[in-house]
Amino acid sequence: MAAGPIIAGPIIAGRAGRLKIAVLISGGGSNLQSLIDHFGPGVAASPIEIVLVLSNRADAYGLQRATAAGLPVKVIEHRGFPDRAAFDAALDGALRAAGAELVVLAGFMRLLTPGFIEAWHDRLVNIHPALLPSFRGLDTHRRALKRGVKVHGCTVHFVRAEMDTGPIIAQAVVPVEAEDTPESLGVRVLAAEHKLYPAALRLIADGCVTVEQDRAVVRSAPANAVPLFSPPLKAD
């Protein structure tokens, strides 16, 4: 697979018009729906255009969400390929044919090959249901509760070959409640994801994100942010 250009400085430096994104899904597509609500057809002054919704599963409900919104959809079943590299080559071809500038993973349940990730270096983002670098991988809510952390949350990051290790773009913090179960905590984290992902993509589209020494820097971050305490501190 031929590698695309390695982007230096702002992720969208020199780009004219709206940022063209492709969204990759495998299931229900609730994060996709949030992106549709923020950037879909008919959204006034959107800095982002969704040029393709692609799934590796024909039965993914997210495809229905995309079709209802009038978005282009495509299915590439991974089971029809002899290996991961062949599947990723087909994926790469579809993304480039659609004119995608940024690839957005939204519940895409396939590990991508290092060659694909390098081809889309700093043009491939994911959202993870934990505050990275803590709780990489699966089953994050149960593991967070088992460790007794007082805050949990979600992270938007650029993708690297090692899972859940890429430069962190944005995070949302969700306080953990004493009676939380993995399910109840997961509901609140997912609600935070639906707000965080569109906000992070807008930062990229607006040219606010750079990658410097494999660290994502966001120039629009407010100064003197107020710390969050969990449990909340009692008033003096």
Report each predicted region and the residues it spans.
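N-terminal Rossmann-like dinucleotide-binding module
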Residues: 2-61, 65
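Donor/substrate-binding cores of folate-linked one-carbon enzymes
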Residues: 38, 106-219
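N-terminal glycine-rich "phosphate-gripper" loop used for MgATP/nucleotide binding
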Residues: 55-57, 79-80, 84-85, 98-114
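Short beta->alpha connector loops at strand-helix junctions that form conserved
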Residues: 74-79, 127
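Short, structured coil segments at secondary-structure junctions
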Residues: 69-70, 120
